[in-house]
Design a protein with these regions (language model features):
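Conserved short beta-strand element of beta-propeller blades
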Residues: 22-24, 63-82, 107-128, 141-143, ...
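Predominantly a core beta-strand signature of beta-propeller blades
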Residues: 97-103, 150-153, 197-200, 244-247, ...
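CRL adaptor-proximal regions
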Residues: 1-24, 32
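A common structural microfeature
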Residues: 30, 42, 72-74, 85-88, ...
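Beta-propeller blade signature
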Residues: 87-95, 139-148, 186-196, 233-242, ...
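Beta-propeller domains
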Residues: 80-105, 136-137
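Short hydrophobic alpha-helical "box" of cullin-RING ligase substrate receptors
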Residues: 21, 25-56, 61
């Protein structure tokens, strides 16, 4: 009988040992250690055991790294290749050997569409809407889990739309304007809360043809095309406290003539009308001031902007990428000193760039 009890205890002890994340360590201490492994090695961690894979794909892992300030930001770029198919690449901006790498293949149904948007909320990147030559605007949404490196179907939009703008504010995705089906409201916008789903709204100040957007000071700004008659830039701003869209500051809107990005509360715009020149909006004096020009040898317009911390990344055709620190930006003979990242061998057009932090 004692022998059976001893064997049972040994089996129980073995099960506990097998279940431990790291043999001989309590799980909380194991998580403390594993969470400090740089993000670029997380794919390797998943191969060690099923428990490690489950951990590194879990909300617990995501929340722990975020709370301990261990999370790292990577840049994701949605591109379109020569065959008019969508593809997506990722860049680790802190890697000593920075280069763009393809991520898990996009869902087949979305690869040939046009007018799709991407947005990031938490550890997920969403691929929204779109249309085709023989396909009306769709409400389909696909969700990419950056921890699991896998795509799944997401909650569909309230309104089918394509060629629209997306932003995140107060932990919600805003899908604004664009073209929809014949029955859809051209002045509509949708909000997505993961706990509630999509809710549709309407405002007469929303117009379908949106070219750019950004979030600054807790407000969403959208810009439409420049009028060929008046050269006037139509821009509106959303105030979440009132739920109303109203016309944006005319002086600010007048200089918003290219892709925009906000870093540390400051708005920057890339003027691509003659070369590539970075402009900065001075809130206090309400004027646009030039930061400097970028070397034409490094940039390949049309470009997109994305910011990580105080560094701005200018991403152009073929994912040619220029990185500059706005606090340390230096001009030499009118050209900004910057570092660059090798482009791909292809000439893919960059549709949008977003940051995802894990």
């Amino acid at each position: 009988m004692e022998e059976l009890d001893s064997e049972s205890n040994a089996m129980s002890q073995m099960e506990l040992t097998q279940q431990a994340l790291i043999c001989g360590l309590p799980d909380d201490l194991a998580v403390f250690c594993l969470a400090r492994v740089p993000r670029k090695y997380h794919r390797i961690l998943k191969c060690v055991s099923r428990r490690w894979r489950d951990l590194t794909c879990s909300e617990e892992w995501y929340n722990y790294r975020r709370k301990q300030n261990l999370d790292e930001t990577w840049i994701y770029a949605l591109c379109k290749d020569r065959s008019e198919q969508y593809c997506c690449y990722v860049l680790d901006p802190n890697s000593p050997r920075r280069c763009w790498k393809p991520i898990e293949r996009l869902p087949p149904r979305s690869m040939k569409r046009k007018g799709m948007s991407i947005e990031v909320l938490g550890k997920h990147m969403y691929l929204l809407g779109g249309c085709g030559w023989c396909e009306d605007a769709t409400d389909e949404v696909y969700c990419y889990d950056a921890l699991a490196n896998a795509w799944s179907e997401g909650s569909p939009l309230s309104t089918a739309r394509c060629y629209f703008s997306c932003e995140v504010l107060d932990e919600k995705i805003y899908a604004i304007g664009g073209l929809g089906s014949n029955s859809s409201d051209p002045h509509s916008w949708d909000t997505y809360d993961p706990l509630v789903g999509w809710i549709s709204h309407s405002d007469p100040n929303i117009v379908p043809e949106i070219e750019d957007s950004f979030v600054m000071d807790g407000k969403i700004y959208i810009r439409c095309g420049i009028s060929s008659v008046t050269s006037h830039v139509y821009a509106v701003v959303y105030e979440p406290s009132s739920g109303i869209w109203q016309h944006a500051d005319a002086d600010m809107a007048s200089g918003w003539q290219g892709p925009a990005v906000v870093t540390d509360g400051t708005l920057f715009v890339l003027d691509q009308t003659s070369g590539t020149r970075l402009m900065m909006w001075k809130k206090g004096t309400r004027v646009w001031v030039p930061v400097g020009r970028l070397s034409p040898l490094l940039t390949r317009p049309p470009c997109r902007l994305v910011a990580v911390g105080k560094s701005i990344f200018v991403v152009g055709k073929g994912l040619s990428t220029v990185m500059l620190d706005v606090d340390k930006a230096v001009n030499v003979e009118g050209v900004m000193v910057s570092s660059s990242i090798p482009k791909l061998n292809s000439d893919d057009d960059v549709i949008s760039c977003k940051c995802l932090t894990i």
